[in-house]
Amino acid sequence: RLVEYILQMPALEVVDVANNLLTGTLVPSIGRLSNLRYLLLGRNSLSGTIPGEIGILSSLELLGLETNALEGSIPTEIGQLENLTRLNLARNGLSSSLPSELGNLAKLQLLDASKQSLAGEIPSTVGNLRELLILNLMGNDLSGTIPSELGRCTSLLEMQLQRNNLSGTIGEEVCNLRLDYFLDNLRVDCVSKVDCDLSCCTRC
């Protein structure tokens, strides 16, 4: 009923109902809220999938869906949200892989998709996120190597990749991410799977 009420206000710019006891699903008609800038639904009990129609919300700056019971894949249409600065999908039941279209989010500062069942490789297109400050993908089933393209994320301050199935070596480009500051937090699994002998790899 709350969703039905919200959909009656097409000029709405902010929806913040985080940390409640909301249940139900995200309906495709949410794409009708074309003026929406903030959609904050975290820490509820929402279920179902993330509809692709969310990509129609071209004004969206903040999308918070963390700590719900969402499942399925991250829709590729999220890559159409060119004004998005924060994307928090953490602690759901999302699976499949990270879509390469995430690399289209040129203004993104936070990407948190931690603690669920995402698989596959980290897409090299994440290296396009030059404004990214925080990247948290810990606690998934991601595999493959850590892409060297992450070295292009020149604003990055924190990167958490531990508790995955990543392998290989972290390249020197990671330690060169900041010109004026050190990379504050780089967390990986430093035993057997990932070789991290770099000075900036301060935590395992």
Which role does the model predict for each range below?
Residues 1-4, 26-28, 47-52, 71-76, ...:
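The feature encodes a structural signal of leucine-rich repeats
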Residues 1-38, 49, 55-60, 79-84, ...:
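Leucine-rich repeat
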Residues 15-17, 36-41, 60-65, 84-89, ...:
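Conserved hydrophobic beta-strand positions in leucine-rich repeat
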Residues 64, 82-145:
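Eukaryotic tandem repeat interaction scaffolds
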Residues 154-204:
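Leucine-rich solenoid repeat scaffolds
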